[in-house]
Amino acid sequence: MFEAILSPFRWLMSWLLGAFHSILEFAGLPADSGWTWALSILLLVVLIRTLLIPLFVKQIKAQRAMQAIQPELQKLQAKYKGKKDQLSRQAMAMEQQALMKEHKANPFAACLPLLIQMPFFFALYQVLIGARGAAERGEAMDALSADQIRSFEGSTIFGARMSDTFMNSLGAPGSGPVIVTAIVLILLMSGSMFFMQKMLMTKNMTQQALSGPMMQTQQIMLYAMPLIFGIGGINLSLIHI
């Protein structure tokens, strides 16, 4: 089921990746360079993010609407403070929903861009992680030809193969470039993930709104996601980072 859903996304991601690589090759970049493949992936990610800008705008508007009704939500919480019976809890929930509907505030709108991105990036990850097996078999994969797969799998950055991982390189002879490159990439990606989300939160939310329960949960995720990515990154190949 999951594979059937991702299959068209994977084909699209592989086609776009190959198209960007061909464009960069036509522009004069070496076809087998790791930098050419890395730039192709970067352009693909930028394209997806650009297409999702309207959703990010909707997310910001939803956050501002939630910010605007925080005083009213706090009044409702004070009104029903200490009331634990089911009728009171239902009444509070209904009043909160009515307030959000009136002001067109949706606490779940912030999740929409993430949910839309997930199939695209899961598909891209499958393309990248499946390249090694396809290269070993000498096969094409989705929209990428066998030659493109071979070029992708054999490409290097700073002498480190794109398919190498931090953990698999520990203690191996000549693994210095892989380890250094992996650490730098993990720090850069974790840091950029943190600062981009932090900037989005502080720009669009007041301190009062940031102290609310929902925003406190988002702040936990703000620190947790880069940490999870950093820990998981040591097991990913360089191109997956």
Can you say where each PLM-predicted feature lies in the sequence?
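Membrane-interface amphipathic helices and adjacent TM-edge segments
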Residues: 50-121, 194-228
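Non-cytosolic segments of integral membrane proteins
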Residues: 86-98, 102-110, 114-186
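Lipid-exposed faces of alpha-helical membrane segments in multi-pass integral membrane proteins
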Residues: 39-51, 184-195, 224-231
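Membrane-interface starts of transmembrane alpha-helices
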Residues: 32-44, 181, 214-218
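Conserved small/polar residues in nucleotide/adenosyl-binding loops
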Residues: 240-241
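Interfacial loop/helix-cap signal at membrane boundaries in integral membrane proteins
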Residues: 1-40, 144-178
